Amino acid sequence: MKEVMAIIRMNMMNKTKRALADAGISSMYAKECLGRGKGTVELPRYMGGVEEQYADMIQELGVFGRLIPKRMIHLILPDNLVKTVVNTVIQVNQTGRSGDGKIFVMPVTESWRVRTGESGDEVLDQ
């Protein structure tokens, strides 16, 4: 069992969610986060091309020390679905430009379903 954590652009969340659903992956957790890599900040790209929001976003980025708003997706999967998820996220989000995102894969050693007390792979929605 693995956890896949993907950090993507905010404006790519719906496309990513649809592509994962089309690939048979429907269970996930997502949240807003702030972060940055080593690249420089190019505001129009990070703002999803919505020119009306430039002033608001510039002000917000200044408050947060130039951290960029992103989406973080967490998926807990059986080992055999990890490559499918990774390939799908890359296919949808890869533009070849700085800020496309990051994907991390981590082992999950134990899991339980609170409602039933089941444990292990049985708790995964497949």
What are the residue ranges of the model-derived segments?
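Positively charged, small/polar-rich N-terminal and surface patches that mediate targeting and assembly
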Residues: 1-126
